[in-house]
């Protein structure tokens, strides 16, 4: 069975029993499922070996099998008898006494359903006889982690009508802090399930309460899911409400809270960027991905800064209407430099010609910036950085003048 792919990244040299018993939870990123295609001492075929580990007494073995179910379906889905055996394993795992195994299985149900829909002609039968009963049973699962995972599988109207009111009540539960902690840990999943409008109307106020909770574990959980909440909010709410709230978490006196906030800083910052300009975007599942830059970036620069050939033909009035300069907050003065800085570089008047207007100066700076390649620009900036006062850095001025704050941030991420 050499064609069977292995599911993890690195293969360890020694796998005495071709299993996971000696590796514990640290092998999440290891390639430890070699038991499927490496003949072991038991000389079992791959499918029988799969059953052995799926029904192992070791919880971690069963977790790994549940986590790799999609690949298992790809391997054994062509043979009808093997497929039915795998479906029986899925049913057995769905009834596992260990909540972590059921949670792993629940996360695999949507991709498994998509795969079976594309590859099985009898998908309606498989859906009604196997998958739907599992989903219905998990809706009443006693473990709250599994119920929270179910929210992403329901429609927005259903979640908002049935789950959202109760979830908001539990967020304010003052009897047991463990209840609020579970709500905080799964806040991002609920925001994604109900959508932007309900998030801003009902959940953002509750999120503010949880971020100000006296128990530091609540604030830490909020810092960990901050990116998901930001992703479900509009740009206005993101700037005016979530950004100051995140600053509070970064400055939290508890080291565990501000450490979690710093770990979320990069993903949270990326939610402010324009994907076509910055090259980054968040997928539906909250994962940070790369946006293709080739055409979008060129068009973005062309729209953000006027072309050099047309710079002289554009009037200052039309420029102020199309691209309003952004006033940045004054920076703290540095010893030896003046604290007064201008938003756009002004050209001093001379006897050779009339003085250049502030807007035209901004336009020329932006156009010059677009003509410089990233490599040349980076080298020139670094070589001249120590010789320039703070107010003379062309990077900040050329970013701030042509566009809005989102463009400034996008340029910063790109360069």
From Swiss-Prot:
Q: Which segments carry the HEAT repeats?
A: 86-124, 163-202, 203-241, 242-280
> Where are the compositionally biased (Low complexity) regions?
301-318
Return the SUPFAM superfamilies for the record: ARM repeat (SSF48371)
The protein's UniProt keywords, in alphabetical order, are: Repeat
Which residue ranges does the record annotate as region Disordered?
A: 301-362
| InterPro entries (UniProt xref) | ARM-like (IPR011989), ARM-type_fold (IPR016024), HEAT_type_2 (IPR021133), PP2A_Regulatory_Subunit_A (IPR051023)
Entry coiled-coil feature ranges: none
Summarizing the function annotation, the protein's role is:
May be a regulatory subunit of serine/threonine-protein phosphatase 4.
Q: What is this protein called?
A: Putative serine/threonine-protein phosphatase 4 regulatory subunit 1-like
- Provide the species name: Homo sapiens
């Amino acid at each position: 069975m050499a064609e069977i792919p292995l599911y993890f990244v690195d293969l360890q040299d020694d796998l005495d029993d071709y299993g996971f018993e000696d590796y514990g939870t640290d092998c999440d990123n290891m390639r430890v499922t070699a038991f499927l295609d490496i003949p072991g001492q038991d000389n079992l075929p791959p499918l029988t070996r799969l059953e052995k580990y799926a029904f192992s007494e070791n919880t971690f073995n069963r977790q790994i099998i549940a986590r790799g179910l999609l690949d298992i379906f790809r391997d054994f889905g062509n043979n009808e008898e093997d497929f039915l055996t795998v479906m029986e394993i899925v049913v057995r795992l769905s009834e596992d006494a260990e909540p972590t195994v059921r949670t792993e299985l629940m996360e695999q149900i949507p991709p498994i359903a998509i795969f079976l829909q594309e590859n099985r002609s009898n998908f309606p039968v498989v859906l009604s006889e196997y998958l739907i009963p599992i989903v219905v049973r998990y809706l009443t699962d006693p473990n709250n982690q599994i119920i929270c995972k179910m929210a992403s599988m329901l429609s927005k109207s259903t979640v908002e009508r049935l789950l959202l009111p109760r979830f908001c009540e539990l967020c304010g539960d003052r009897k047991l802090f463990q209840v609020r902690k579970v709500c905080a840990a799964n806040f991002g999943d609920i925001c994604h399930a109900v959508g932007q409008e309900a998030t801003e109307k009902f959940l953002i106020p509750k999120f503010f309460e949880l971020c100000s909770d006296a128990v530091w574990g609540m604030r830490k959980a909020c810092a960990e899911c901050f990116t998901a909440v930001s992703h479900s909010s509009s740009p206005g709410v993101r700037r005016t409400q979530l950004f100051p709230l995140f600053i509070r978490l970064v400055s939290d006196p508890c080291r565990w809270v501000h450490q979690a906030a710093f770990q979320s800083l990069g993903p949270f910052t990326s939610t402010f960027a324009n994907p076509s300009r910055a090259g980054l975007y968040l997928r539906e599942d909250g994962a940070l991905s790369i946006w293709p830059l080739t055409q979008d970036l060129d068009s973005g620069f062309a729209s953000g800064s006027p072309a050099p050939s047309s710079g002289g033909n554009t009037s200052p009035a039309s420029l102020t209407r199309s691209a309003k300069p952004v006033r940045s907050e004054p920076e703290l003065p540095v010893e030896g430099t003046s604290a007064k800085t201008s938003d756009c570089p002004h050209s001093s008047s001379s006897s050779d010609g009339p003085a250049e207007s502030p807007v035209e100066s901004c336009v020329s700076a932006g156009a010059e910036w677009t003509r410089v390649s990233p490599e040349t620009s980076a080298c020139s900036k670094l070589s001249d950085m120590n010789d320039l006062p703070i107010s003379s850095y062309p990077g900040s001025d050329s970013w701030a003048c042509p566009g809005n704050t989102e463009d400034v941030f996008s340029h910063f991420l790109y360069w």
